[in-house]
Structures are given as C-alpha cells and as structure tokens.
Amino acid sequence: ADLLIVGGGFTGLWAAIEAKEHNPNLDVVLVEGNAVARGAWGQNGGFVSASLTHGFSNGLDRWPNDIAKLTQLGQQNLNEMEQFVIDRKIDCDWMRVGEMDVATEEYQVTELQEFVEVAKPYGEELVWLDQAETRRRLNSPTYLGALFDPDSVAICDPARLAWGLRDVALSLGVRIYEHSKVVDLDERGDRVTAKTEFGSVTAPKVLLATNAFPPLLRRLKYLIVPVYDSVLVTEPLSEQQRRDIGWAGNEGVGDTGNQFHYYRPTADGRILWGGYDATYHFRSGFGVQHEHSTKSWPKLATHFFSTFPQLEGLRFEYGWSGAIDTCTRFSAFWGTAMDDKVVYVAGYTGLGVGASRFGAQVSIDKLLDRDTDRRKLEMVNTLPIPFPPEPFKSAGINFTRWSLDKADRNQGKRNIWLRTLDRFGMGFDS
C-alpha cells in the first residue's frame, strides 16, 4: 500500500477519504480490529460540534493567539461535514439544530451571561435565554436560563454516519479490512509493516487512528487514558409526554456542571441521556466488560427524572458505556514516529465527532507533506502533559473526580488541587 490507516473510526475513515480525494491513484488500505464504528464512534452521544478545542474556553485558555483561527476553521469544518453528508446522501439523521447549555445553579447563570461577551469578539454568535424562554423551548423545573449556540452544533446517529463514510471510502477505492487487529509495527528501511493476526500490510506511510484503544506506540500510553462514559436511551415518548416537555427545536442540550449531562432527542422519538460519570479503570483498563457495566445507570436515571419529573414512569430501553480517549489538554494532538513514517492523532476527549475530520486532515497534511495553514497552528505542534505512571495516575484521576464533584456541590468553587491543575494546564474531562 501507499498509505496504511490503522483504525476504522471517524478519524481513520475521514483520513482515507481525504487521501483518496487528494490523490485518487494512492493505494490506501484501512485495517480495523473489529468492525467499522464498533468503538467510540458508534457508541457516542451523537453531538457534532464545530469546536476543535473541546469548547471555546479551553481553546482560549490554551491557544489565545490562535483561537480566532481555530474558531473559524471549526465552523468551516462543520459546514463542510454537513455538505458532505448532503452531497453523499448519507442517511444518519443529521440535524443542524444548535445546542443549549443550561444553567441549573445561580452561579452558572452569571458565568454563562459573562461568557457571551467574552466569546463575541472571536466570532461566537451566542444567545442568552432567560428562564421563561429556556423552559418554553424545553420544560424542566431545574432550568434557570441557557446559553444557546444556534449554528455550531448538529446532532446525528453516529454509527450510521460512520457506515456512510465507510461506503464513500469504498467507492473511492479504499481497501478496508475489518476484524484485522494490528498487534505490532515493524520499521524496516523506508517502510513500516503492520502485523495482524492473519497477515501483514507494508507501506511507506502509516496513520495510527486508534484513539482510546490500547496504543501501538509506547509513548501514547502516557498521553491518553481510556475513560468510560455511559448513555441511557428511553422508550419512545407519547405525544402527550412530548407536549409536556416541548423540545420543538430538537436542540442538543448540556448542563454546565463540571460533571455534566448531555442529551438529545432521537429521530424515532426517544431521548438519549448520557454523561456525568467518567469512569477510569486501574492501569488504563479497557475491554468489552466495561461497556456492559451498569454501575452508573441508576444515578443517570435519577438525574433524568430530577430534570424531567413530568416523565416519571418512562422506561429506559437501552444503555451502554463507551471508551473516550482523554488527555490532559482535552483536545486532539498529533505526533510522529519512525522517522516521520508514522503519524498519530488522539486525545479528542469526548468531543471528536466533528473534530475527527479536522484531525484526519492534519494527519494527511503531515503524511503527504502538504503545506497548509492547519500545520502552522500551535495546537498542531504541541503535545499534552503526560499522565504519571500508576498508581499515581489512578489516584490523581480519582481525586480529581472527587474534587470536581465537590465543586459542583459548592457553587463551582474549585479547591487547591483543581486550581493547581488549572495553573499547569492539566485536568481530567470527558
């Protein structure tokens, strides 16, 4: 092959498409250890954000000199994604409906109102909704107001989006091999061989797009950790239940605590409700057994009915957990290995459905040595601070989670541990 891509999630699929559209004569091979969209890309909440930096505030704090450009590139990325879905007729329930970030505590009202003015000079067109308008759109007694972003978020069925991208990649001539787990990379001369359980693929250029899965490069073990986020999906709402809550605009919704929930309506009339608990398992524990853990479900269900008491008695029909590749800066990073023959990208930290396309484009820029503005960004040319080894990693993550929970119960006031992490540009999120 001319280009080998390891990983059949959004990053890998977008990269394959990007490479073939750049040069149709490239022989592009994509290998996936399970099935396309089997990982986080098929299990996530289905929010497609324009943000490339896990939210505007995170980007402003870390890359103030580039945030205007990053905001513009993120909006362009979302617009191009939407046009791609339309042009390629990908049936994935795509809706450009925006997002409401709701305040459920008084201190959050002040923070969100101030944020409108902070973000405005950088092209963020945000609208403050008072309590009455917020509850007119979506009726919860917990809402005190909301920040509405009308244009920077879409919602979709992520698995069907990934399957659509797979079909496009195949139509362009990409060779896709599923159930072909890569177990080792071997550098020989000017080529790299990826060994699977059933054979091998050799190429001069390799992209590692495995994200939360156990990494093939040792260095990535210290840059990302897998955390598990849980989702519940209700049975379809009756017409009366839908009238009771409203939601005519179908907006995506998130609350604004440190430990937050995200939720959206589905095309078949259900509510997808997820978030809050981001669970880390000792020694970066990873596997199917964690996807079926029901530990967080009762807590999520309690929070759901606290938000929508008028839906008491509604049943949850589905639930699952999926792994997120979190890093200390909460957003994607890139690097190279084996004399630049291998490029890796990871660290989306739970906001990667949209950002993965950008991540793929930057990766192809690097692999094909394309001179683009994207490659000059500080974000693209820096790495996150590594996590410490065990047992310090587990202790630090769990103490951070405890501190975030304490802050949520104390008007958002961050203790000395969280303030220290903030000072050094570190943290834990999903």
Where do the language-model regions lie?
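Active-site substrate-recognition segment that forms the wall
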Residues: G46, D87-M95, V182-D184, D190, ...
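Short, well-ordered coil/turn residues at beta-beta hairpins
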Residues: G7, S51, T196, A203, ...
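Dinucleotide-binding Rossmann-like beta1-alpha1 core, especially the glycine-rich loop
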Residues: S51-E133
